[in-house]
């Protein structure tokens, strides 16, 4: 499945602008010159509240279990550790900035690099 997904991701990127969430997109597109990757993290208090309000009452433990699955998937297919700041164009702590402002920050970041 990873090989097929990677092929589709690369085809999408070659055909124009796109946004890839997850699926090791940072790794798959690492050789694309106009590739930007972002990592969003948050502290446990923020994640607990967001799990409660936005994800049908998910507990912090459930969220951390999902994160571990993401990390395992990423490491299995890339041989690298998931979430390492140096792998991303920009990392944002969502506990410190409202999500709409984080989105604005990402847009501005890309605009600055494309200028």
For the regions a language model picked out, list residue spans one by one.
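Small-molecule kinase domains that catalyze NTP-dependent phosphoryl transfer to phosphate-bearing small molecules
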Residues: 27, 57-100
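Conserved nucleotide-binding/hydrolysis micro-motifs of P-loop NTPases
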Residues: 25-26, 41-47, 97-98
């Amino acid at each position: 499945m990873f090989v097929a997904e990677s092929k589709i991701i690369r085809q999408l990127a070659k055909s124009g602008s796109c946004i890839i969430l997850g699926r090791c997109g940072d790794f798959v597109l690492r050789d694309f010159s106009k590739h930007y990757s972002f990592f969003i993290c948050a502290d446990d208090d923020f994640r607990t509240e967001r799990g409660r309000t936005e994800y049908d009452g998910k507990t912090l433990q459930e969220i951390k279990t999902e994160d571990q699955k993401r990390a395992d998937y990423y490491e299995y297919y890339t041989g690298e550790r998931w979430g390492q700041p140096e792998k991303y164009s920009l990392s944002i702590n969502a506990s410190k900035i409202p999500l709409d402002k984080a989105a604005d920050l990402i847009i501005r970041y890309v605009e600055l690099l494309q200028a």
